[in-house]
Amino acid sequence: MSNKNYDAIKAHYAGSDARDLAAMMAPITNGTAWTEMAGFPYAGTYVGPDAVIDGVFKRIGEDWDGYTFTLEKLVDGGATIVGIGTYSGIYRKTGKKMSARVVHVWEMQDGSALSFEQFTDTRLVAAAMG
């Protein structure tokens, strides 16, 4: 039996791989609370798709070359979906490469994201920026 929450997040990551922002934002609603970890350069909670795009994705695009999230495992917990993988990229201002393990925790309802929370090694990201 298919889980539409799992399928929605699987499609989000497929959109990320294809650099398709619309596909990435499909499960994000006006009420989705998207939290970037404290210590991360874009730390904070952004509510709704416009805030996520402006506060996170546009800034990543401006600051990094080749920034990617490589999904290695997607865990179907029903209403909780967990993506495990690696961030990588080159910080434009320093030319330094970064690779950091990351976990994304999604709380879902009927294929829509209620919340997203990121956990990553912010020190590795900061080292590339400094």
Protein language model regions, located:
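Short, mixed-charge, low-aromatic patches
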Residues: 7-17, 41-44, 60-64, 84-86
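Pocket-edge positions in alpha/beta enzyme catalytic cores
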Residues: 1, 44-45, 117
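A beta-strand edge to alpha-helix "cap/lid" segment located at domain peripheries
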Residues: 4, 57-130
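A solvent-exposed, acidic/Ser-Thr-rich amphipathic alpha-helical stretch
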Residues: 23, 27-79
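Hydrophobic pocket/interface hotspot
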Residues: 9-12, 24-25, 32, 48, ...
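Short, electropositive, low-hydrophobicity segments enriched in small/polar residues
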Residues: 19, 23, 52, 89, ...
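Short, low-complexity N-terminal intrinsically disordered segments enriched in polar/charged residues
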Residues: 1-30, 127-130
